[in-house]
């Protein structure tokens, strides 16, 4: 069995994570006490991917919950599925990181990290064939961003050959949570570029837009946003959990999606989008699903794929459907919009089909795209970063925890390099000879 160990860090990560476990338990017929009440053998066939079977037929999530303050943990514990998790797997401090990346990465977080790693080892040891780790966290805060990236680099040292995928909530253009978000996000990207295999980027603003525009919710709550996120996360992992005609696992996904090691930030989309209360009354067809999931309105990240080109993308269908029809639709999309796909990676769209649809739907699809348009996000963060860093605003909070200004400068230039790499591949054509001239590449990046 190919198991995944799930880690959730910080307030955002724990809220998304606990929603994800609600949805996944529901799909596998697990009730809040960990008992199985399903109606199909398929629910149990690969349940080991995310659950351990404990005594007397109880299923326990392979989840590690960490935070630097007890608040969020308490609300997870008090929530509907709070009794599902293993009590030892709640690891928390008392101080809080106070949205300070340095506290999460260097001081408070560093004190707690060893007890988290003990739990990670314990979970990893109980796996037959550990496939990899997934982390849910935000990039703008202190714990999820600072301590989350610290955990990634520690786990990387210990399990260098296992896939590390993250679901990272990136700062939104309009909805800002804290003033120092650009600092925290830039420092996080600096780490994720080096230490993660694949990052699925999510963004509150895009999620709000989906709630307003598509779901017609007037006052969306974080619960609604997290519902969308959990649908997408479940979609990306469904072929690990259920049998299907064309399966893909984390490693296959990484191999197909990452053409260059640093460019591993993906956008995810989901179709059909339904609000929590009302599932749609009419079943969608494969062409409609395909068209919807490539639609920029369905992307959970505030960057417009039409402003860039797809290096690669993967579409995961769920439900009973014909493989032939899926292939035709994929081909159709690529042929009609060929200018949006780089021509120097032929057949860069991968489809996979999983036979079991999500609860309440006949079919659904999850879209994962590696597009150069994601540079819009990094550009936006970099601009805000530079504006504050030029005046050294708020820096004392970080230097006070022992950080050096040099680290900020490095993170900033790493971010700018990332943007110019995306730009370089967006402009590249199949005919051109080899490498760009070094000077040219730098000039392009500055514009």
Swiss-Prot record:
Q: Which domain of life is it from?
A: Eukaryota
Q: Which UniProt keywords apply?
A: Cytoplasm, Cytoskeleton, GTP-binding, Magnesium, Metal-binding, Microtubule, Nucleotide-binding
Listed binding positions for Mg(2+) are: 69
Q: Which InterPro entries match?
A: Beta-tubulin_BS (IPR013838), Beta_tubulin (IPR002453), Tub_FtsZ_C (IPR008280), Tubulin (IPR000217), Tubulin/FtsZ-like_C (IPR037103), Tubulin/FtsZ_2-layer-sand-dom (IPR018316), Tubulin/FtsZ_GTPase_sf (IPR036525), Tubulin_C (IPR023123)
Asked if Transferase is a keyword of the record, the answer is no
Tell me which residues bind GTP: 11, 69, 138, 142-144, 204, 226
Q: What else is known?
A: There are at least four genes coding for beta-tubulin in this organism.
Protein name per Swiss-Prot or TrEMBL: Tubulin beta-6 chain
Species, as recorded? Ectocarpus variabilis
């Amino acid at each position: 069995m190919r198991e995944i160990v799930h880690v959730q860090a910080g307030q955002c990560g724990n809220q998304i994570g606990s929603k994800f476990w609600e949805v996944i338990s529901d799909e596998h017929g697990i009730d809040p006490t960990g008992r199985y009440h399903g109606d199909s053998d398929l629910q149990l066939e690969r349940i080991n991917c995310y659950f351990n079977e404990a005594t007397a037929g109880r299923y326990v999530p392979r989840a590690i919950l960490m935070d630097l303050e007890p608040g969020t943990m308490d609300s997870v514990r008090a929530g509907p599925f709070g009794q599902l998790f293993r009590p030892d797997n709640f690891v928390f401090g008392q101080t809080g990181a106070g949205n300070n990346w340095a506290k999460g990465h260097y001081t408070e977080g560093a004190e707690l990290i060893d007890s988290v790693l003990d739990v990670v080892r314990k979970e990893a040891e109980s796996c037959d064939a550990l496939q990899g780790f997934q982390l849910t966290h935000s990039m703008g805060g202190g714990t999820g961003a600072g301590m989350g990236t610290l955990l990634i680099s520690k786990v990387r040292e210990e399990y260098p050959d296992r896939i590390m995928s993250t679901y990272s909530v990136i700062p939104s253009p309009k909805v800002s949570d804290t003033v120092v978000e650009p600092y925290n996000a830039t420092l996080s990207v600096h780490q994720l570029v080096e230490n993660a295999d694949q990052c699925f980027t999510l963004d509150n603003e895009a999620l709000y837009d989906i709630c307003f525009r598509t779901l017609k919710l007037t006052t969306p709550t974080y619960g609604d946003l997290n519902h969308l996120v959990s649908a997408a996360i479940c979609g990306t992992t469904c072929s690990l959990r259920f049998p299907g005609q064309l399966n893909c696992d984390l490693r296959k996904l990484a191999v197909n999606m990452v053409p260059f090691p640093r460019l591993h930030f993906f956008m995810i989309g989901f179709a059909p989008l339904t609000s929590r209360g009302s599932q749609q009354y009419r079943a969608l067809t494969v062409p409609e699903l395909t068209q919807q999931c490539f639609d920029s309105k369905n992307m959970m990240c505030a960057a417009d794929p039409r402003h860039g080109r797809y290096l690669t993308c993967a579409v995961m269908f769920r439900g009973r459907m014909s493989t032939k029809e899926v292939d035709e639709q994929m081909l159709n999309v690529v042929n009609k919009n060929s200018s949006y796909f780089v021509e120097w990676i032929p057949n860069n769209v991968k489809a996979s089909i999983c036979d079991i649809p999500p609860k309440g739907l006949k079919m659904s699809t999850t879209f994962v795209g590696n597009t150069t348009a994601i540079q819009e996000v990094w550009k936006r963060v970099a601009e805000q970063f530079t504006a504050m860093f030029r005046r050294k605003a708020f820096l004392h909070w970080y230097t006070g925890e022992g950080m050096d200004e040099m680290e900020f400068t490095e993170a900033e230039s790493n971010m700018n390099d990332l943007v110019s790499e995306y730009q370089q591949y967006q402009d590249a054509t199949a005919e051109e000879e080899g490498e760009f001239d070094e000077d040219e590449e730098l000039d392009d990046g500055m514009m």
